[in-house]
């Protein structure tokens, strides 16, 4: 969508239309829910058609095509729930979703519901009074095992919920590692100076613009995030030009058989966040109803 204005400045609308409305009508579909506009989705042939239209004045290149970047190795770390917790998750999901009519789900309600399932996977959840209820240590144990395997190498940890951060801090307090929560430029400087072993970061607070490549080569996502853009930009805090390392490692802690796997599938497909969350939730509701 942002491409129209850039091309208009070059050709005054000759290739992509004289105004943004023409561009949208030609290359996008307006999504609605319950009669209300939600967002725009590119038509199936939008990308190749647009690229062909502007090919005589533009060249499309990925950063890795023209920059010297380290190799980026992404991998998933399977987290297995014990039998007791697995049954509790299944019951929690049923109780949460079976009361919902999949035909009336909105992007907002889907985000809230999948957020609760992601919290369960992480090991704690906010109750109706916004108090934290601890559920299990399966993911935190897997995280600490991963940190131990790094043998002291610095690591950026992306967390999703405030209770994730607090439980991670409690677990790391039992080690001799120097741990910081990212709060601003001072932490960026300390990280790049090699004075932080584990830097806890919420993805929305530093996914853009920060140069952290000098301080380490490891990233771990404690809580998978639906947004491909946030994942991609988070990775680029270390995977960027000027890194002193030849490899950068990005790990994802993924609870098996649960919503974590749906999030990872969405990231790999690079699909629209809101639409994907709604589709995944509807599929889970339909599956549960089919089991009754």
Locate the predicted segments by residue.
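Conserved Helicase C-terminal RecA-like lobe
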Residues: 68-213, 271-273, 278-292
């Amino acid at each position: 969508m942002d491409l129209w204005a850039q091309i208009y400045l070059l050709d005054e609308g000759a290739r992509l239309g004289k105004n943004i409305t023409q561009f949208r009508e030609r290359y996008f579909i307006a999504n609605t829910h319950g009669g209300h506009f939600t967002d725009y989705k590119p038509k199936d042939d939008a990308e190749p058609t647009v690229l062909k239209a502007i090919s005589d004045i533009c060249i499309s290149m990925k950063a890795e095509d023209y920059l010297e970047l380290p190799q980026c190795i992404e991998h998933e770390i399977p987290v297995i729930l014990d039998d007791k917790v697995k049954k509790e998750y299944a019951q929690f999901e049923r109780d949460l979703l079976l009361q919902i009519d999949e035909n009336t789900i909105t992007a907002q309600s889907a985000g809230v519901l999948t957020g609760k399932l992601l919290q369960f996977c992480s090991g704690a959840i906010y109750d109706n009074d916004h108090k934290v209820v601890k559920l299990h240590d399966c993911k935190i144990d897997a995280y600490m095992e991963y940190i131990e395997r790094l043998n002291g190498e610095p690591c950026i940890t992306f967390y999703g919920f405030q209770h994730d951060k607090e439980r991670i801090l409690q677990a790391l307090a039992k080690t001799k590692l120097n741990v910081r929560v990212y709060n601003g430029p001072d932490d960026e400087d300390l990280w790049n100076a090699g004075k932080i072993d584990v830097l806890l970061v919420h993805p929305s607070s530093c996914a853009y613009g920060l140069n952290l490549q000098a301080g380490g080569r490891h990233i771990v996502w404690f809580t998978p995030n639906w947004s491909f853009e946030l994942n991609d930009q988070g990775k680029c805090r270390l995977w960027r030009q000027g890194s002193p390392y030849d490899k950068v490692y990005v790990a994802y802690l993924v609870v098996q058989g649960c919503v974590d796997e749906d999030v990872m599938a969405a990231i790999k497909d690079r699909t629209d966040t809101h639409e994907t969350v709604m589709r995944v939730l509807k599929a889970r509701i339909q599956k549960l109803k089919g089991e009754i």
